[in-house]
Amino acid sequence: MQQSQLIKKILLTTVSLFTFMGSVYADSIGDIVESTGIGGIVRNNETLPHDIGSDIVLYDEARTGNGRMLIEFLDKEELALTEHTQVYIDEVYYDPNPSLSKMSIRMVQGTARFASGNGKKINKANIDITTPTAQIA
């Protein structure tokens, strides 16, 4: 009897832990503030619309076809995507001390502009942008 209760508690704890971990990674790190034409956000293999006000979360893939998108992160940094662009948001970490904040974005194709001067200014050494032909770090 005690063994089955212990197993139930362990299972409940494990399920709770995985549920909590999923919610940690689902926290918004920014949102879409401008959107035109064709595009979307790929999250967990599901394509979501790129409507103004839609949340961006860690590990999202932002894509545009014949469209454009402007993502504003919580610290007011901006990522603007032009037509036929695909980027992965690999790491975003905010700290009250901007020199400790980090951002890592991986470009697959297209053209994007990252504006880091609007917010608390992430230390440039902590920004990593990788493209198919170069790495800006």
Predicted regions and their residues:
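Helix-centric, low-specificity signal for extended rod-like, repetitive segments
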Residues: 1-2, 106
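Flexible, surface-exposed loop/linker segments and immediately adjacent secondary-structure boundaries
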Residues: 26-68, 72-137
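Bacterial N-terminal signal peptides
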Residues: 11-20
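Bacterial N-terminal signal peptides that target proteins for export
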Residues: 2-11
